[in-house]
């Protein structure tokens, strides 16, 4: 049993701007406990008589200043706790502080650089490294990840649900047994045999966490998360099992609503966060008071889950994260006061050992059977009754495991019962005979199959040859198509930089018959149409959300928009930097692999030389009837020293390669996490853009329906400006001079003719024109053509016939 108080540490976050830095000092006297002094200057607006306290001093186990890196924090805080967990004690590390003070960065780490890894990934690396070194015990590791959001628990690692939102995850409920032990229903435990599997589970859970932007923090975690490592160990053949668990807790940040001014959904989240932290503080105060008979653990889910960590069988450590900017000094002082109360709590950590009853029963049964066999051998008693079915099945299982065991020293232990010995010999004989019969049947069947398959081989070869030829043709066609598309894309990028005013001032409208500017038509026809994806047409609006999904389901326009969004995103620089680092690590790993192979071959060569040298000396001594000289051979000693040097070099490079492997996998996880975040933000942005375009844009006629289209001069100007911004994406806007606009999607090759003007729109027209003049007559040169003469003539005839029908309909209605 280990009795100790909760260890408290402080970490100071660097300020965003230096002029916002508050006044503080750190006293790290070796004879005394380090202390942090915060100076809160008096406000002159409070008047001349102001007795407000200016200096606040707090003591911690250690204080990490702004320049402390993640490695230093892990070595001094998490490593001792992880070592006690390996020894069989429970451990907890939790970070407490206001929002934006660096709790998530300390516990989980940053997503930008590998050196920014937090306590969780570094602890996983340390634990699995120690497990590999200790081969005297059998270890089993399980991972769980719990999120508490608005007083509801969610399992972030549930494999049975594909979570697109937090509500899709299964809810975790708290159950309590008669011994007042807490059990979490619906919280899954995932076994992790390697560090890579554990990091993958951490990455999976982090992608499902609730993160939102607040005035204090752009990526504020809006929930409490508890990452738990369950570790069990036992020695081979022993019935004693050690269990330990390590809670790594990332609390949501407290914030003063009056200061931040949040509202709506963020306000609801802030209420739940502040309430749960208030209940946590109540538990801390109750535990620090010696004569309190009741501890209010059940007030919140978080205090119920952390019952052992706060006042029970656990070695607990707290990290107070401080943001010592001028505007945050009050919250930082409050955090330090909370830490001082936490330091008064004393826990009693007990070694979690238990005896597995199943292993004890199995060991005792085996011991009883051995004693019975020894007794039968001594007394010479022979049993005559037949073996039971259970005994026969047990003997056959023993024989099967004996035959499958590759160990040459394995034994078939059936005791001194001659009935069992005879049955084992009979069973082995039966297995041998069955194997011979099976081999004979297999040989005969193979000979028959060869005779039958000879006529079919030629036909099968011919079919395979035809299929191969067909696949080659398909590949050639696809390659040609790819080259053409690449050429179109390059020309589109080249022509996309044309000045828009020159395009509008051009005398000839686009898609003129016989237009020699084929590159212009290629640009308009090959540029991805944002109109196809924003879908202002009513019929396509229902398909919008289906297109906003994973990258492989995106349309061409959506993919281009995603590339632009990714290029302009703030995380693109981080992703590119990680790509460069990953490329360097891959190159280094490749070079190390080659060096390791060279060292391995050199070690083998040196061993062979030493062996040959030794054989030559022995042969020389035998031929000359001389004993082997006692003095060591200098050449052999030199070879042995080279061999040892190569072994050390090989071991060093191999260790570095393993570290590189872990770093590469962590970088890949960071990149995957950034890509998932980028994808989610793009989906939100894309949906907002599509919704805004549908709300702000007027009704546009489809090919099958025509409706009156009325606009004021202001709305006409806004609509024209909106569509002119989309002209580079493939939209063509034409003002017919009657208060109407014709919109055609030149990529989709669809023409949306203007409807007949209503009488109201004719009154609004500046110049009165005859009714037949108001019918839009699209110039032939503005019709998008294909280049084929027959097809183009059919298109022109169809447009003329349609305009004639529209004109007759308008005349008939008037």
Curated annotation (Swiss-Prot):
Annotated compartments: Cytoplasm, Cytoskeleton
Domain Kinesin motor: 5-345
Oxidoreductase is among the record's keywords: no
Bias (Polar residues): 759-771
SUPFAM superfamilies xref list: P-loop containing nucleoside triphosphate hydrolases
Disordered as annotated region, ranges: 752-788
Main localization of the protein described in the UniProt heading: cytoplasm
Keywords: ATP-binding, Coiled coil, Cytoplasm, Cytoskeleton, Microtubule, Motor protein, Nucleotide-binding
GO cellular component terms given for this protein: cytoplasm; kinesin complex; microtubule
Residues engaged in binding ATP: 97-104
Stretches of the chain forming a coiled coil according to its record: 356-385, 456-494, 588-683
GO MF terms held by the record: ATP binding; ATP hydrolysis activity; microtubule binding; microtubule motor activity
GO biological process, one term: microtubule-based movement
Classification via Pfam families: KIF9, Kinesin
PANTHER family xref list: CENTROMERE PROTEIN E, KINESIN MOTOR DOMAIN-CONTAINING PROTEIN
Similarity field: Belongs to the TRAFAC class myosin-kinesin ATPase superfamily. Kinesin family.
Protein name per Swiss-Prot or TrEMBL: Kinesin-like protein KIF6
Gene encoding the protein: KIF6
